[in-house]
């Protein structure tokens, strides 16, 4: 994909990939279970709050990456 868009910085692509990856947190993720045990929450509570939080973090990071792409 990078050769098709030579104006896009490879660093921005890497940040965008990382930003999108944190939004896909599911119950098979080991950090999900670590957060569940550390917080003492039920499975439903952890799924609701942790998944929502990581999704919001991913969207904010992608928006920041988009803004950063204008600077770099």
Swiss-Prot record:
Superkingdom of the organism of origin: Bacteria
InterPro entries: Glcn_transporter
GO cellular component: plasma membrane
An example Gene Ontology molecular-function term: gluconate transmembrane transporter activity
Pfam families (alphabetical): GntP_permease
Protein name: Putative D-serine transporter DsdX-like protein
Species annotation: Escherichia coli O157:H7
Classification lineage: Bacteria, Pseudomonadati, Pseudomonadota, Gammaproteobacteria, Enterobacterales
């Amino acid at each position: 994909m990078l050769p098709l868009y030579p104006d896009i910085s490879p660093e921005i692509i890497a940040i965008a990939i990382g930003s999108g990856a944190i939004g896909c947190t599911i119950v098979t993720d080991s950090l999900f279970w670590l957060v569940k045990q550390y917080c003492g929450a039920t499975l439903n509570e952890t799924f609701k709050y942790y998944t929502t939080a990581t999704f919001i973090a991913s969207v904010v990071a992608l928006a920041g990456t988009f803004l950063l792409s204008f600077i770099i």
